[in-house]
């Protein structure tokens, strides 16, 4: 229940950061983000209620994805972790937030889902092909994208895939590697988004086709 409360708390805080850009695109992206993430929270709450009805416990531990409760909770985590077919909110919302907001979003929102997956579904083998797919498909979108902050959003989705693979493997070494990767990713992706913010402030555009000679 505590996880659900703060899960929804991050949604509200994230939407505020997106709306802070005060553009029409940011408003539309923020509303899509809000609807999708509230849906994620409802799946989490439904799974928690069913889990309590079945076990009499609300302790956050390892869940069985073969049960209804486990499947609903996994779906909630998958939405926030941007699983394939559940990922569009990320590339829509992150580039439309303020520069500072994008840095904060990249550092904390998806990492909450990675942490939750590691706590609840470590060693769930079908996470390996899901994560492998996540490492591959964003690259094809990134290479044809003109908005550099969207490129970084696809790159973020790609890196989440490696973390999901590590969680799916579920060994002590793979989970330690996932934790280290997540920690490093918070730092270097934030720096990349800050550098794109500096380019935006300096040039007034973030379109790759309109930039050149940045030295």
Residue ranges and their predicted role:
Residues 1-2, 13-215:
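Hydrophobic transmembrane alpha-helices and their helix-loop junctions in integral membrane proteins
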């Amino acid at each position: 229940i505590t996880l659900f409360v703060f899960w929804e708390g991050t949604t509200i805080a994230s939407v505020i950061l997106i709306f802070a850009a005060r553009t029409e695109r940011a408003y539309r992206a923020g509303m899509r983000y809000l609807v999708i993430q509230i849906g994620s929270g409802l799946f989490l709450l439904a799974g928690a209620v069913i889990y309590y009805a079945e076990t009499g416990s609300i302790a956050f531990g390892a869940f069985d994805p073969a049960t209804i409760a486990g499947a609903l909770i996994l779906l909630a985590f998958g939405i926030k972790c941007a699983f394939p077919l559940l990922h569009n909110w990320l590339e829509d919302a992150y580039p439309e937030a303020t520069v500072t907001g994008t840095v904060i979003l990249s550092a904390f929102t998806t990492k909450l889902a990675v942490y939750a997956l590691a706590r609840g579904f470590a060693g769930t083998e079908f996470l390996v092909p899901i994560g492998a797919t996540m490492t591959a498909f964003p690259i094809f979108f990134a290479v044809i994208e003109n908005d550099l902050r969207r490129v970084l959003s696809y790159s973020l989705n790609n890196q989440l895939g490696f973390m999901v693979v590590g969680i799916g493997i579920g060994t002590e070494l793979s989970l330690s590697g996932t934790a280290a990767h997540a920690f490093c990713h918070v730092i270097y992706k934030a720096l990349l988004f800050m550098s794109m913010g500096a380019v935006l402030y300096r040039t007034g555009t973030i379109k790759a086709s309109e930039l050149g000679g940045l030295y």
